[in-house]
Amino acid sequence: MAKTKYGERHRKGLWSPEEDEKLRSFILSYGHSCWTTVPIKAGLQRNGKSCRLRWINYLRPGLKRDMISAEEEETILTFHSSLGNKWSQIAKFLPGRTDNEIKNYWHSHLKKKWLKSQSLQDAKSISPPSSSSSSLVACGKRNPETLISNHVFSFQRLLENKSSSPSQESNGNNSHQCSSAPEIPRLFFSEWLSSSYPHTDYSSEFTDSKHSQAPNVEETLSAYEEMGDVDQFHYNEMMINNSNWTLNDIVFGSKCKKQEHHIYREASDCNSSAEFFSPSTTT
């Protein structure tokens, strides 16, 4: 028993059948406009909150006393996924069931089932790659032609790799030899030209090799035109830029070329003079 502010004592605990009958008969006769006055008028030593919960959850007409069916479970699971733990709103879609009853049934039965379904959905969301791979294997089993073509293609690729491996090794060895060989110094065109033609003064046209300016190509080209060998000018310039020749090769090669050119001119002059003094011309 608990005392109120007016000194009255209120009962707590289980409701007796006599108390249930008093509350039911009073509410059916007079209604429940104000729950604080209901226990006083009904002659009950209970507070208004206890009377309200007893009426809503146990005594009001239309309540279902049997167990919750499978259809009701599906309804609870469906609306719980969208509404969450709002039991009073879920109870509106289940006539005859109270929010307290739905909440108790959820925590005692449906929560475990819901957790299992969530774990299965997570497993299904992770498993599609394996299912796709299994489908590919199944397609390969159903279509043996694709398997044969795949094997032939892989065999061809293996042969190509084997045939290309010696060339790759030789290329690797050549590159290693080239990297280990001493690097040929790069020649500037002014250095080569001064060494090839020492009688010509190019000091006014060229500066230091590290800070060299562009040579006067027109004068150099005109010198080669006098020799009648413009192609040799372009060929020497290309070989110098590519650094494929050493200094000795370029210098001696150009000197030999120059000597051959002079010898050829002297020979042609001799031939022309011999023809001029031939007996046929004198007579």
UniProtKB/Swiss-Prot annotation:
Does the record's keyword annotation contain Ubl conjugation?
A: yes
Q: What tissues harbor this protein?
A: Expressed at very low level. Expressed in cauline leaves.
SUPFAM superfamilies (UniProt xref)? Homeodomain-like (SSF46689)
Q: Keyword annotations for this protein? A: Activator, DNA-binding, Nucleus, Phytochrome signaling pathway, Repeat, Transcription, Transcription regulation, Ubl conjugation
- Residues in the DNA-binding region annotation: 35-59, 87-110
Gene deletion effect: Partially blind to far-red (FR). Impaired inhibition of hypocotyl elongation and cotyledons expansion under continuous FR light conditions.
Induction line: By hormones or elicitors treatment. By exposure to abiotic stress.
Name any GO cellular component annotation.
nuclear speck
Q: Where in the cell is it found?
A: Nucleus speckle
Q: Tell me what PTMs the record reports for this protein.
A: Ubiquitinated by COP1. Ubiquitination takes place in darkness and leads to its subsequent degradation, thereby preventing to activate photomorphogenesis signals. Ubiquitination is stimulated by SPA1.
Q: List the molecular function annotations (GO) for this entry.
A: DNA binding; DNA-binding transcription factor activity
- Name the Gene Ontology biological process terms: far-red light signaling pathway; positive regulation of DNA-templated transcription; red, far-red light phototransduction; response to red or far red light
Question: Mainly resides where?
Answer: nucleus
Recorded consequence of changing K258R: Abolishes the speckles localization in the nucleus possibly due to the absence of sumoylation at this residue
One Pfam family this chain carries? Answer: Myb_DNA-binding
* Occurrences of domain HTH myb-type (ranges): 7-59, 60-114
The subunit structure is: Binds to FHY1 and FHL. Interacts with COP1.
What role does this protein play? Transcription factor that promotes photomorphogenesis in the light by participating in the transmission of phytochrome A (phyA) signals to downstream responses. Probably acts by activating expression of light-induced genes. In darkness, its degradation prevents the activation of light-induced genes.
**Protein name stated in the entry:** Transcription factor LAF1
- Which organism does this record belong to? Arabidopsis thaliana (Mouse-ear cress)
Q: What is the lineage of its organism?
A: Eukaryota, Viridiplantae, Streptophyta, Embryophyta, Tracheophyta
